[in-house]
Amino acid sequence: MMKLANADGQVSGSYFYEKYKQDIPLRGQLNGQGYVLSSSIYGNDDKDVDHLELTRAEDGIKGAFTSGSGKQLPVDLHVIPSGAVPEPKPGLHFSRGLDDYEKLQLANLTFAPGKTETVGGKYVIQWYTESRSKVSMFRVVSGYPAPVIASINNVIDSDFYENLSGYFGCSDETGKPGTDTLQVSDRYLDDRFVSYAVSNSWFCAGAAHPDFALGGTTIDAKTGKRLTQEDVYWLGIGSKPAPNSDAWMKYRDAVFGPAVVKLLKRLYPKEMMPVGDDNGCNYADPDVWKFGSWRLAEKGMYVGAYFARAEKACDNPEWSFIPYGELKKNNPALFGG
């Protein structure tokens, strides 16, 4: 499978083998009806890179492929009409729409069942590993009513597929996986919530530097629906804004960030002390708390901090939990207070 984008004769894109699913970056030129492409990131003189010479025809694109080792193969590509590719798995919901290339990349994945474990003495989960990436995720087996389990697992599967899309779409300069880690780093299940964190680190071809992130998901164990942070801990007045809307951005900037700093100063005065130089982690800055990750855990709601590139080591401190006592005062209907 291949996708190409043309900007004034400069072509960029990627392709993958169905056997591996991993993106291999492409770059080159379009001259008239002909493409001259290479899997090199920075220049055509790199060793062990693939080369393609392709020509557009009525029924697709044809040409020749030469591997880095010199092996030559014919190429015969057929255009897939936009929107013709079905979803990789029915019923999943992604934070952004997948294009046809990504849908094909996620199609026909296989998952090997792994160990089962009991969480909290009651809730049974089973782990599954995707065969190509070796990335693992759990699904809920028992502990909640069957219809709720189905909804919970739909949210988990949606996250899993979206993370796999990111994995296959990130390659290093040789076309091998650019993702170093992608794993569940924490999970919490009780009679009211299913919550987990996913840690990710990567260095994709063409990027200026490696990066890492922590993502969180929390699900209502009564309904099986995904919860936003505003569903759990709302500090505003009136109706809650839609996530990522202008009103939500304003709320996060003017209300949420400052309120979290005020609360954390009371809960963790030592950790929130202002730093005396430019090299410290300034957790007293409301901006670093506005858009961080969050999840529920034994200690309460974890709120992550997000710093600029030069201070990334300060991201997501271990201590920044809002206890359930505070959450109950804010949202007694949800937390049984």
Whereabouts are the PLM-identified features?
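Central antiparallel beta-sheet cores of small beta-barrel/beta-sandwich binding domains
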Residues: 1-58, 62-65
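Active-site acidic/histidine clusters and adjacent loop/turn architecture
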Residues: 82-195, 199-203, 291, 296-310, ...
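Short helix-loop boundary/capping segments
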Residues: 216-279
